[in-house]
């Protein structure tokens, strides 16, 4: 298994995808993103749209720790595929 990244994706593409996921999770948990972070999400709107459908569907009331754990499980499953 190649832990460096997904087949067919450059390290830069993987970085962008992971950063988008983290920013979306932070936003979903109620964090205020900086202007630079919001601009990053606007710049990579296509990646944002694909990642939104992959985010765990958990209530914000569930608590940040539970949401982060669900995100971690999702990341692990993505790497196995």
Swiss-Prot record:
GO CC, any one term = beta-catenin-ICAT complex
Entry superkingdom: Eukaryota
Q: GO MF terms on file?
A: armadillo repeat domain binding; beta-catenin binding; transcription coactivator binding; transcription regulator inhibitor activity
Which InterPro entries does the entry mention?
Answer: ICAT_dom, ICAT_sf
Q: Does the keyword Cytoplasm apply?
A: yes
Pfam family membership, one: ICAT
Q: What is its main location?
A: cytoplasm
**UniProt modified residues of type Phosphoserine:** 59
Any coiled-coil regions, as ranges: none
Function summary:
Prevents the interaction between CTNNB1 and TCF family members, and acts as a negative regulator of the Wnt signaling pathway.
The identity of this protein, by name, is Beta-catenin-interacting protein 1
Report the source organism: Bos taurus (Bovine)
Designated gene of the protein: CTNNBIP1
């Amino acid at each position: 298994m190649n832990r460096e990244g997904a087949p067919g994706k450059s390290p830069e593409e993987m970085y962008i995808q992971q950063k988008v996921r983290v920013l979306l999770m932070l936003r979903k948990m109620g964090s205020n993103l900086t202007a630079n972070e919001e601009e990053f999400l606007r710049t990579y709107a296509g990646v944002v749209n694909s990642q939104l459908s992959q985010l765990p569907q958990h209530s914000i009331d569930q608590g940040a720790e539970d949401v982060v754990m669900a995100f971690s499980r999702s990341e692990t499953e993505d790497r196995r595929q």
